[in-house]
Amino acid sequence: MRLGFHMPLSGGVGKQLNRASELGMECIQIFSGNPTSWKPGKITPKSRDLFIKKQEELQIKPLVFHTPYLINLASPKNDIREKSIYLLNAALEKAKAYDAPYVVTHIGSHVGEGVEKGIDLVSYSLEKIMEDWPEGVELLLENTSGAGSTLGGSLTELKKIIDKFSGTQVLGCCFDTAHAWGAGYDISNVKEVETTLELVNEQLGLDLIKVCHANDTNVPLGSTKDRHQHIGEGNITDEGFGALLTHDSFTPKAVIMETPKNGTDCDQINLQRLKKVVGRHEEE
């Protein structure tokens, strides 16, 4: 597996690559643009070329793009849905420009219209995006904690969407551990991980998971709450993370941490903790 973090855009992506290298990261996730804006980030050929050159030099791969939080492919409001389609299209194009194989997105909320209606609207949105899909980029639908009318708390919801496009092979899943815990998927120890992965394989298919967001959380299991915590400071436990991430279905994945940035050395501490948990502490 390759371990890394979600990194802020401040200072430019080149600066973040250098920071990632200093910390010993092997992959990186960044936003495709301002996470709270409907305006997509611009692609500047010069900065893109410098980034790709630096990425190759440092061997920090893969680069994963995360879409802005505003996207709601399930919105019953046409204007919100159309803006979401536009923003997601821009993220996919940016990923192609930067040689990034994956774009991670939250699919959104049905806003009280019901799960099936929400799934239909997501499928409609993706059909529109499929009309001009950039080659070499895969869209990963992220599971959620299942709060309110948000889609993706149950992996079966993601599977229903992905199955509608089974012939395209451009859709997969990003599995977030904190979100899974909030949605009721217990991954706190070896036994529970084995049971949960059997369920995940049944509901979704382990082969569809291409990226893992490794985040601890201190919310109660099945609470539908979404709060990220530092590795080792929540309810998932070292045993749970170790059993999950060293499972055969997860070892080839890019593992991205989205842990709190509330200290200058918190990323370094989280990285070393996770390395130790998965049996790579000898690299320290």
Swiss-Prot record:
> What PROSITE patterns does the database record attribute to this sequence?
AP_NUCLEASE_F2_4
Report the InterPro entries cross-referenced here.
AP_endonuc_2, Xyl_isomerase-like_sf, Xyl_isomerase-like_TIM-brl
State which Enzyme Commission number(s) the record gives.
3.1.21.2
Superkingdom of the source species: Bacteria
The cofactor required is: Zn(2+)
What are its GO biological-process terms? base-excision repair
Annotated Zn(2+) 3 binding lies at: H179, D226, H228
Locate the residues binding Zn(2+) 1: H66, H106, E142
How many cofactors are bound and how? Binds 3 Zn(2+) ions.
First-tier enzyme category under EC = hydrolase
KW Zinc (keyword) present = yes
**Alphabetical keyword list:** DNA damage, DNA repair, Endonuclease, Hydrolase, Metal-binding, Nuclease, Zinc
User: Which parts of the chain span the membrane according to its record?
Assistant: none
Q: Which reaction does it catalyse?
A: Endonucleolytic cleavage to 5'-phosphooligonucleotide end-products
Tell me, what is one Gene Ontology molecular-function annotation carried by this entry? phosphoric diester hydrolase activity
In terms of NCBIfam families, this protein maps to: nfo
Family classification: Belongs to the AP endonuclease 2 family.
Record's function text:
Endonuclease IV plays a role in DNA repair. It cleaves phosphodiester bonds at apurinic or apyrimidinic (AP) sites, generating a 3'-hydroxyl group and a 5'-terminal sugar phosphate.
- Its recorded name reads Probable endonuclease 4
